[in-house]
From Swiss-Prot:
Its EC number is 3.1.26.4. It catalyses: Endonucleolytic cleavage to 5'-phosphomonoester. This is Ribonuclease H. It comes from Acidithiobacillus ferrooxidans (strain ATCC 23270 / DSM 14882 / CIP 104768 / NCIMB 8455). It is found in: Cytoplasm.
Length: 158
């Protein structure tokens, strides 16, 4: 029997860059769905994209086969093309600059190593149902916080 694949649809966003930001995860396995979200009062879009993937993978209780589907090429390319070189060069880019968001990249690399992860990119705002849903989720989180909400992170089953 083939192993079931967990799907993590992730997105991060920011109003202003830097500015208020949020991340969201739509997790799906065998017909069950769960959402995770969080808010950060001062951040960047890229940090929220990375945080969404990190929190989604951290939510998995045991090593799993996972598809991480994101509209962030920064996330996908970082994990599939750039990470090994950054590590080899002491967290420097090919141009010699310090890698931005190194703190999250290091955490993400460590948690991803526990799983078999496929990193997939989808075009944002193109009608991809799950990407649109997770984008709407993180925008609701930013709206609620802007309206005086206090929760920084949350989750729920659908």
């Amino acid at each position: 029997m083939p192993e079931k694949i967990i799907e993590l649809f992730t997105d991060g966003g920011c109003r202003g860059n830097p500015g208020i930001g949020a991340w969201g995860v739509w997790l799906r396995l065998a017909g069950q769905e769960r959402v995770l979200w969080g808010f950060v009062p001062e951040t960047t879009n890229n940090r929220m994209e990375l945080t969404a993937a990190l929190r989604g993978l951290e939510a998995l209780k045991r090593p799993s086969a996972v598809r991480v589907i994101s509209d962030s090429r920064y996330l996908r390319d970082g994990m599939t093309q750039w990470l090994a070189g950054w590590q080899r060069r002491g967290w420097r880019t090919a141009g010699g600059d310090a890698v931005k968001n190194r703190d999250i990249w290091e955490l993400l690399a460590a948690v991803a190593a526990r799983h078999q992860v496929q990193w997939e990119w989808v075009r944002g705002h193109s009608g991809h149902i799950e990407n649109e849903r997770v984008d709407a989720l993180l925008n609701r989180v930013m709206d609620q916080y802007a309206a005086g909400g206090q929760a920084r992170e949350g989750e729920g089953w659908l």
